Amino acid sequence: MSEPHRVQFTSLPGSLNPAFLKKSRKEEAGAGEQHQDCEPAAAAVRITLTLFEPDHKRCPEFFYPELVKNIRGKVKGLQPGDKKKDLSDPFNDEEKERHKVEALARKFEEKYGGKKRRKDRIQDLIDMGYGYDESDSFIDNSEAYDELVPASLTTKYGGFYINSGTLQFRQASESEDDFIKEKKKKSPKKRKLKEGGEKIKKKKKDDTYDKEKKSKKSKFSKAGFTALNASKEKKKKKYSGALSVKEMLKKFQKEKEAQKKREEEHKPVAVPSAEAQGLRELEGASDPLLSLFGSTSDNDLLQAATAMDSLTDLDLEHLLSESPEGSPFRDMDDGSDSLGVGLDQEFRQPSSLPEGLPAPLEKRVKELAQAARAAEGESRQKFFTQDINGILLDIEAQTRELSSQVRSGVYAYLASFLPCSKDALLKRARKLHLYEQGGRLKEPLQKLKEAIGRAMPEQMAKYQDECQAHTQAKVAKMLEEEKDKEQRDRICSDEEEDEEKGGRRIMGPRKKFQWNDEIRELLCQVVKIKLESQDLERNNKAQAWEDCVKGFLDAEVKPLWPKGWMQARTLFKESRRGHGHLTSILAKKKVMAPSKIKVKESSTKPDKKVSVPSGQIGGPIALPSDHQTGGLSIGASSRELPSQASGGLANPPPVNLEDSLDEDLIRNPASSVEAVSKELAALNSRAAGNSEFTLPAPSKAPAEKVGGVLCTEEKRNFAKPSPSAPPPASSLQSPLNFLAEQALALGQSSQEKKPESSGYKELSCQAPLNKGLPEVHQSKAKHHSLPRTSHGPQVAVPVPGPQVKVFHAGTQQQKNFTPPSPFANKLQGPKASPTQCHRSLLQLVKTAAKGQGFHPSAPATSGGLSASSSSSHKTPASSSSALSHPAKPHSVSSAGSSYKNNPFASSISKHGVSSGSSSSGGTPVQSSVSGSLVPGIQPPSVGQATSRPVPSSAGKKMPVSQKLTLVAPPGGPNGDSSGGTQGVAKLLTSPSLKPSAVSSVTSSTSLSKGASGTVLLAGSSLMASPYKSSSPKLSGAMSSNSLGIITPVPIPVHVLSFSADSSAKAGVSKDAIVTGPAPGSFHHGLGHSLLAGLHSSPPHAAPLPHAAVPTHIPQSLPGASQLHGKGPAVPRKL
């Protein structure tokens, strides 16, 4: 370890000066002394604290900084002149401020100190009300007891008791007077601190108080003031609870007796009666009614009661109006009863009982009055016992049968005995009645509940079975949709897939309760009892009753059923028998309101009603098409207006189609195929010799929607498409040629005879009609779950009525077309003049344009079918009479054959949709196609176009039963027109009871350059009786629009006849298939060959029936004909 460092001392050289050493020592010593002098003052301060016992006034409290400061001040103050120096020192502001605060504190303590003031409190409270204006009407001193208590008396325990009972007095003792005098003597001394004004005021108070005491001693007699005081106190107490005058008088009597007892005990100084009476008069001025009761004797009270009786009602009301607010007298009933109600029997007799009351009621009233007398003096709660309530309820039930005046009189009579007013009695009786009526409902409600309990198990079991079946069907449907989805993915666009999802939702079975007579009867009984118990005002309207019934059914009756099985509106409807007499006003209004037909569309489009003018069907119809589509759908012609009848009837009122179809069947039983054959023969004979047949120039409107319809029909009705084998071209060749020659010859002659009908071409009157229909068609056709339905909308025209309904095949959607009057049945009446048809057509265009929002767009040429159909917009205006709409892309050429991007070189000139059963009188609707209708379009392969037949849906209830199916037979494989366009027409004659052929077109219309379409459309109306008288008109009609456009395409097409159920009772109808190769163009005798072919059914077509079949047999189908066949000529069930 190292040694610690040591400081080495250094010796100073030489010796130090001793004087220096002394001086330094002295300085150090002096400095030490000074330090010791001041240090104890700063560091060691001794403070002596004196503690004392704390009390409610003070407690020991010390502030250390202040104590140290005070001690230092004392130390400084030891020197003489320090204090003066401090105060005079201009820099000693702190000390000056402290002195100022101390002086101010002393001043406030002297002025506001509380020690002396506490002794003054009782004296300050002697007269708290001093200073109020006694003449102020707002201040009521009538009940100030200190004015009534004489100086010789004081309250039993001292002070005043407000609203706590009658005051009890005792003689004031001398000691109390001495105490008061002592207080008075002390009071001036205590007021020395107060200002002069306050002293004067207090002196005045004392003087007035002494004067009052003296005056009270001299004026008051105990008998007078005690009675008044008691009654007044009682009156004030009654404000909180309304007491009757009767009770008040009883209390008054008791107070009088108590007062007599006190008089005997105390024997106060008697006061002259004159002075007492004067006091009573003065006191009575403040309350006129109490002045009547202010007497001190029984005689005076009796006199007061007599005076009350003598008062008139007006005087009494006047007195009541002067009484203070809240007075119990204001609780009286009407003037006639006001005072008599509460007076005792000794003062007033009760109001008389009305005369003519039923004996049982009068007996009950007397029983109640007797019970009231027996229970006199009891409170209201104690009085109304169970027996009393029973009597009152019986009286209430009997008085309900009487008039309101008699009823009021009975209750007024009862109120004079009972401890309540008439109104209170009426309310109590009403409540008792309602409560009793509520008890009556328990038994019927229990019976209803039991009946429901008996009926529910069976219905719930049935519902469970339905749910199970629905679940199974849903699973099966999902499996089926999975299969269909693959095909849709190939065919439909994504957008269409999304649209279809919205419409495929299927609701499960509903919980619908099946009513029986027992439950319905019990429900009506419950409602009747409820209404009887309701105490609604007599003048209430039906709305109040309806609300009452609905609320009752919803709250009390509906819960009797299991949850979800019953609705309040159903209960209201089923129980109408029970409440109809009260709610009938509203019910009648509701019945009168027209019911709206709701059309459920998957695309949620609103209903569209198009009013079709009368002559619409008769005239030719141009096809305003905005978009040119590759394919031309001929199915549209037979689909859109299967039974378009233009009539000459005056203006039959629009009738419902469902109601009129059977009538049509009865009225037109004579239309038969034989008659049609005769007409055809006549037409053929007239047309003989006409060699030239020239079609009028086609209209400029490009046919756009027709092909779209075909594609849409195919792609939407392919739930389970099975390609049908195309018939060999050779088999169809010769009959078609034969038919075409006949039709052309006939058309030529018709054209010459009736050229003016060509003026109807270019009229797009069918467009408005079709405009709304494609939407239905598109939206409705999407239900793939339905078996192959022909989704083409149809217009069924009943013969007697002009109302046209479009029945949607799959979903029974219908759109009402109410044509004007001229639209009549031409099969029975004379034909309409050309001008009439022309006007009606124009009117149709206008009306449809208004109702449907007709907005044609510029013709956009979408070359291929895929192009036009991909534009999925639905343009209602662009659809012509064929109801064609821009269909979604459906690969008619799915195998790869694509249509060339060429617009239609020529459009359909007169695209009158001549449905097979067009019943347009003189001018059958024709749809004609020019030779080069679809130039440069490659036809799809044989199996493609025809794999999915496009059913032109026949109307569900169509007056004209014959259908014509137009099909284009297969042609050259490359779309050549060398072989000539082959058309197949199938005339579906009157449908039989079960199957009836529904015209179906499954042709994808593609036409090569120069290929001419065969024109073939002859409905039953075409061959009906009107043609006898309208040969000239028929010629023009045939040339322009009588002949339907058959897809003049050399594409393999299958003739499919779909059966439709018919309500007709005729025999089985045979389908007439008219086939034959069409010539290269329409310029060769097509009309003649067509009509002749129709008459002489070809070998492979079903022979025309010769049995008399009515022309207008409505097809009673749920919607339109549902086509779910898998091959050609396969009957389909609808």
From Swiss-Prot:
Its main location: nucleus. GO terms for cellular component: bicellular tight junction; centriolar satellite; nuclear body; nucleoplasm; nucleus; PML body. The modification Phosphothreonine is found at residue 166. Residues 1-166 are annotated as: Sufficient for interaction with HIRA. Residues 973-982 have a biased composition (Gly residues). GO terms for molecular function: DNA binding. Residues 25-38, 81-98, 194-213, 253-268, 480-493, 598-610 have a biased composition (Basic and acidic residues). Residues 892-905, 941-950 have a biased composition (Polar residues). Residues 182-193 have a biased composition (Basic residues). Keywords: Acetylation, Cell junction, Chromatin regulator, Coiled coil, DNA-binding, Host-virus interaction, Nucleus, Phosphoprotein, Tight junction. Disulfide bonds: none annotated. Acts as a novel regulator of senescence. Involved in the formation of senescence-associated heterochromatin foci (SAHF), which represses expression of proliferation-promoting genes. Binds to proliferation-promoting genes. May be required for replication-independent chromatin assembly. This is Ubinuclein-1. It comes from Homo sapiens (Human).
